[in-house]
């Protein structure tokens, strides 16, 4: 019918719609429109042409034609019929019904013809008809959508294809790379040492060169034949602590402890100013800290010594010699000192007389059995140079390794259980005790390591992301399913779309489905995030949600909300459900308002901000509170979420023999966000009864109802509505393997990966839709007795619950719908997984987590013990260094000690990354134990105390510390006090052994004790000043005085000005109460005059409230013949005997004719010279023996691949 005429001129009708200045606009709204109906009617009326003469397409495409319905929608017409009508629209009519045939026809833009399907313009009808015939023809293989949409689909597929090229397509290569990196992260537990097991080197402190030999004949003979003495022959000899001097280790621990002899030239290397200096093993300044770190210094040094000695004693070759088996050394010096009793010298000197007492059967191997049942024996017992302190440390370390040992039968069971019975393994050889596989760890050790992991990662996303990427790489490497976006494109292409609405529903869908980055692994990252739900939170990124300013009529907003709703259950975000709900509530803010009780928040607040239980809308928490009549869609959505949100499942993984790191879950269990079913062993296929399928079906059903609702249908038009519902229905009908994969296959992959990752899974319980059960915090708190120095600290340390890691919803949505399919037509799950995961069990990376956990536990116990000995807080730990004066250590000092121990353990065991340093990064490291807990919204707290297991290295550290206390001279530490008094003599002088020297003490006659401040009281009239004693009375400086070292530290200036001159004059004697102190000794010739005054004055100048230098002592060099001596003046000597560090004097002579005379201590050599010695007896910790029997091991360390037989593996 002709249109109703309007009295409007065509030239006065505007072609551009200008919205009001305050109108809401959007970038997707096109404000430029075609000529209006009024302009078309005016043109038709002015030309006197009826509508039938214009053809079915009207005048070009500038005005509506008969294909437009009364509602404004485009009438759906088959393309073939529409093309035919379009082709015949310009044919001349056979009968012209208009009487005015010659009237002038005024056509709007008659020179341009436009295609109705794609919008292409043509200058003639012939070109338009040919275009329609070639580009829009119908056929079995043709597309039913417009070329613009086809182009969008192809562009979308191409983008995903480019991303797929970045994915690891060769699973074996990806797995091998991860396995190699995991093995590299394993600590260096085993270092073989074929050298001597000793840390003390008997060396010449003062050489005998220049002294007259008593007997020269045989000495010349030895020098001519280059015979090497087994014992030192210097004028003064000391056993020097030098770890590794006789080692022939396979790999260095890089923690050699090398203390120089306590002489003036070498004392600086054993006196430390800072903990860093202790750790590095060299001096920054020759200063000792009795008031701050006398406990810490020896403790840290003992840790360094024990870490250096963690070797496996290896057996060397045993050639036959003099009827006994001894080992052969390439180094002839080492061979000489290894068996000091093997050759007895003919010269009657001090060393020869001692070696003449050695027993022949105490040299070399004990017994001769080298083979057992045709195989090399597991161990060999032998006598050789070996100090029992080093031997004890190594035996304790060997016990630690043996406690971690797994026999082949256990390894086979572990491999089968960890692989979920998918890897068939068997033992190809019989049991033997010659192998050592330190791969196990106890559950308490793994739990403590897990807490340390939490401290190291905390809420640091950069530290947590590599964990997710590593697990995702493993899952991608073993899964048989791959993303295939073409499945989705085929479904989209089957839906016809002839709408001209901008944006097009199909075009907008393909635009939104384009990846924004490297998202091919998004679904695998989300699955991997389930393994670490206590450390990280996988949440949908904010840009995936619809714009809250949009309405429900916005097609992009509808698609975004649908995508978010589908992907939400795949994340570990506890607020994912309410965020997905609010993505729709934002769009329905105007037609369906609901109550948002949170202050400052409304229904238009972006959905991503609803990330706390207190802001959850009550209508979502309880859908029955929503009015079905006023909010039908939101009520239906909340009800659907509560009905179909997936219930979590449980997965068994690992094996109890390996231990379990679970803290909040039962041992060897994993929580899974979806219900689980057993893996089918024969075949796979799509499933339509799983929780995921029901979720997908219910989500699409809801959004179809949204599109059909009055809010949308009355606005977008019937054609657009049918296109939207058609697309949703087509996507819902896609036969995807994803539901089957998530329910039956993915749990197996998660269980296998969770059992082999270096970082064990750390999970918290999954909370569903109850806001009161949402976990808001995961915290680590120190445990231990309260201390005054820690009262101001917080009792807990809180950490944000999980590090946030965003993920794109697009690949999740694709994977959930249809972009995952099986790679083979006939897939056998057992065969596929057996082949895919076998590379994981060909190396020892399976046990890397256990080995790192053991080392972390050992480091924590050692660091805790060192710090506790500096802080008397009541923590029950052995304190062998209690006799050393010690002030309470501050938190910064404890942090330095913690870092020193952490660095030493990482250096000794070649560990990269964090170990125990996380304890000191977020608070005071002075802790006894650690506990971990999570806090729910309702206030409920679940706490787990992670007490460390027994520590072998801590026991070794305690033994070393006890030896330091009992034999401090070996570490240049003297016991007792120092007496400053003038002693002028021509005779011998031995300040370390004060026999015959005057000693006075507190309570003696005429002995005064200085007051607490060392105050000097000047006297008038030229009288000498006086000193206030401890009773507050002034006393004359002359006489005997007792000075506590603490008083001297604060009054050393007065001491140097008034007391020290009186001591040099011989009128005053002072006893400085030290307890223990470092010392150095200067050996000099007895022929020249000497005075100690300059050295003592320098020592006094170095005293400060923060430290005391080593006390300088002097002694003449022992002489072979009686010398002519000069007058010498000495001032300082000890009050106790401190010659324990002197090995001998004048070893090449019969005895010392003049000077200090020390013989070889026979109680250090009972295994060599005592017939009544029982093998295995030790005098530790009272005394260090230098010669002992030891057991050398012939272990083999098979690889996992070499231990087990796995079919199909070469």
Swiss-Prot record:
Signal peptide span: none
Region annotation Disordered: where it falls in the sequence: 1-28, 294-319
PROSITE patterns, per the entry: ZINC_FINGER_C2H2_1, ZINC_FINGER_C2H2_2
Skewed-composition ranges (Low complexity): 299-315
The keyword ATP-binding appears for this protein: yes
Family of the protein in this entry: Belongs to the turreted BTV-fold inner capsid family.
Quaternary organization: Homodecamer; each decamer is made up of two conformers of VP2, called VP2A and VP2B. 12 homodecamers assemble to form an icosahedral capsid. Interacts with VP6.
Primary role: Inner capsid protein that self-assembles to form an icosahedral capsid with a T=2 symmetry, which consists of 120 copies of VP2, with channels at each of its five-fold vertices. This capsid constitutes the innermost concentric layer of the viral mature particle.
Protein name, entry field: Inner capsid protein VP3
Higher taxonomy: Viruses, Riboviria, Orthornavirae, Duplornaviricota, Resentoviricetes
